[in-house]
Amino acid sequence: IYFQLPVPELVERAIKNNEASLTETGALSFKTGIFTGRSPESRFIVKDSETAEHVNWGKVNKPMSIELFDLLLARVTEYLSLNPIYVRSVQACNHKDYAQNVLTVTQSPCQDIFVNNMFVNVDVQSQKSVDWTVLAASNLKIDDHAELGLPTSHCVVLDLTRHVVIIIGTAYTGEIKKGIFSALNYYLPLKHNVLTMHCSANVGKKNDTALFFGLSGTGKTTLSADHGRLLIGDDEHG
């Protein structure tokens, strides 16, 4: 178990494990295998007595039974317990009133670097509890997926009641970020009356804020990068 390793050590491990290499500029470059994007067709949310009435079920938010999730969770925890893992404690949301402590367990130093870069780094000693847990078993496959009624041998499942996200069979790091953002999409509006937004944002000299909404690849980041305004962020806000 490698807990909260510093980034330089993670970079060294990634290169030593032949998982990544340094570019001419010194940046770390790594490949995520056959998955270069998220897999929405294999994403599920556990449907229980609490989520049944609060989730807009359909093609995007596909339900999974508690029993099937528990079966997959048992496989993930057993698999991770038999392999080297990288564990990191971070925070989602900057505002102290809404901050969520997140614990991630991954198989790759590259994934751990991603978590370190994507979420808020805080003093681990100050985190008294874990609000959300992400278990990413990227190299595990669901060989009997057809028998279980799943479309593929990989999947991402959110248990919004027990605050657990499991990722199976995909090393695309965006699944980690989007898993937590999806959890916040459910939790913050329901529990704190906070609207979560997939948008970029900037602010002008008169403290006027502009929001740019759009699907991935539509130009949110480009439009928010205005030399006359300060960038707040380019992807997710509340």
Positions of PLM-derived features:
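Glycine-rich phosphate-binding P-loop
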Residues: V203-D234
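A noncatalytic interaction/capping subdomain that flanks phosphate/NTP-handling catalytic cores
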Residues: I1-T209
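Conserved nucleotide-state-sensing and coupling region of NTP-binding domains
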Residues: G238
